[in-house]
Amino acid sequence: MKIKLVTVGKLKEKYLKEGIAEYSKRLSRFTKVEIIELADEKTPDKASPLENQQILSKEGERILSKVLDREFVIVLAIEGQQFPSEKFSKVIEDASVRGFSDITFIIGGSLGLSAKVKERANLLMSFGQLTLPHQLMRLVLMEQIYRAFMIQQGSPYHK
């Protein structure tokens, strides 16, 4: 199995890079992890709704170019389903059982994601109604993926 994160924007903060590297290392016991950072479009300060849609469309095209047909795709979106960690672990396990060898998580940029990206999702998932920086969301997601694998192992990590 391979876990792939497709994200918009470059990670700059050292503490986030270190945290993600730590969880990538921990996850390497269970799965291969690939992180793809895509360039984000520059958004004018007072962008019109049309300009925002054009930006989302361009970013969406770049995202979808990194997603293969055979991948189980989980898109992080505020309107998605919310799960406790145990259920999230089961979602990952079930995708593998159903024959998906790769699970791809998609995190959009500051404007979110295009409708086409959301339509490609096998699952829309939300971490709640809070607004979080998309860079921080990468770290939170990596921890939850690690937690999911630890739950599958019956580890005391999840307590």
Swiss-Prot record:
<comment type="function">
    <text>Specifically methylates the pseudouridine at position 1915 (m3Psi1915) in 23S rRNA.</text>
</comment>
<dbReference type="InterPro" id="IPR003742">
    <property type="entry name" value="RlmH-like"/>
</dbReference>
<protein>
    <recommendedName>
        <fullName>Ribosomal RNA large subunit methyltransferase H</fullName>
        <ecNumber>2.1.1.177</ecNumber>
    </recommendedName>
</protein>
<dbReference type="InterPro" id="IPR029028">
    <property type="entry name" value="Alpha/beta_knot_MTases"/>
</dbReference>
<dbReference type="GO" id="GO:0005737">
    <property type="term" value="C:cytoplasm"/>
</dbReference>
<keyword id="KW-0808">Transferase</keyword>
<keyword id="KW-0489">Methyltransferase</keyword>
<comment type="subunit">
    <text>Homodimer.</text>
</comment>
<dbReference type="GO" id="GO:0070038">
    <property type="term" value="F:rRNA (pseudouridine-N3-)-methyltransferase activity"/>
</dbReference>
<dbReference type="Pfam" id="PF02590">
    <property type="entry name" value="SPOUT_MTase"/>
</dbReference>
<keyword id="KW-0963">Cytoplasm</keyword>
<keyword id="KW-0949">S-adenosyl-L-methionine</keyword>
<keyword id="KW-0698">rRNA processing</keyword>
<dbReference type="InterPro" id="IPR029026">
    <property type="entry name" value="tRNA_m1G_MTases_N"/>
</dbReference>
<feature type="binding site">
    <location>
        <position position="76"/>
    </location>
    <ligand>
        <name>S-adenosyl-L-methionine</name>
    </ligand>
</feature>
<feature type="binding site">
    <location>
        <begin position="127"/>
        <end position="132"/>
    </location>
    <ligand>
        <name>S-adenosyl-L-methionine</name>
    </ligand>
</feature>
<feature type="binding site">
    <location>
        <position position="108"/>
    </location>
    <ligand>
        <name>S-adenosyl-L-methionine</name>
    </ligand>
</feature>
<comment type="similarity">
    <text>Belongs to the RNA methyltransferase RlmH family.</text>
</comment>
